[in-house]
């Protein structure tokens, strides 16, 4: 799959707009070459057909960029959180490994990716996310509070994106699940 086929014309415009905003928000925290290496990872993931749109047709790269803007602008997180968020799908789908990410971007980024993958796996396995045991397990799995904050930002972004969705039942299910997720466990 070519990257041109993966993005609509409107999504390409949005992608460039989000990219510029993210660069501005991240300021000096991104290291020289981070953006070029990140772009290479994302292109490889797209070209290997490793990531797909979700049930609402949302482009996962756009969704992650929007979430990264929330993470940077509304929460104030910087390099490790932004890169971890943007690269976790590439690691999850096997385009690259956490060890490769650690060598290229550092342990901090790799740690966030491992946390995001573990928490996403936990969410996919547990239908009872509102229980106290689940919240405690989530804290244990996350290990890093930044992972929980990224998950909250992701849920906020999804809820913002689907608010105008025509499929009411799917929208309610996502809102219910996201709402429960937003009740982040506090130690």
Enumerate the language-model features and the residues they cover.
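Active-site helical microenvironments for divalent-metal-assisted chemistry
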Residues: 1-187
């Amino acid at each position: 799959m070519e990257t041109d086929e993966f993005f609509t014309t409107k999504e390409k415009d949005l992608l460039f707009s989000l990219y510029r905003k993210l660069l501005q928000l991240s300021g000096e925290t991104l290291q020289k070459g981070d953006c070029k290496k990140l772009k290479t990872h994302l292109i490889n993931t797209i070209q290997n057909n490793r990531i797909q749109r979700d049930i609402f047709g949302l482009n996962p790269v756009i969704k992650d960029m929007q979430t990264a803007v929330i993470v940077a602008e509304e929460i104030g997180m910087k390099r490790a959180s932004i890169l971890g968020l943007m690269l976790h799908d590439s690691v999850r789908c096997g385009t690259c490994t956490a060890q490769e990410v650690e060598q290229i971007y550092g342990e901090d980024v790799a740690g966030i990716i491992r946390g995001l993958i573990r928490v996403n796996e936990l969410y996919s396995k547990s239908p009872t996310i509102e229980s106290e045991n689940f919240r405690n397990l989530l804290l244990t799995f996350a290990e890093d509070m930044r992972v929980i904050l990224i998950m909250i930002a992701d849920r906020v972004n999804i809820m913002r994106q689907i608010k105008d969705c025509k499929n009411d039942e799917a929208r309610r299910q996502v809102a219910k699940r996201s709402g429960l997720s937003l009740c982040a466990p506090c130690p």
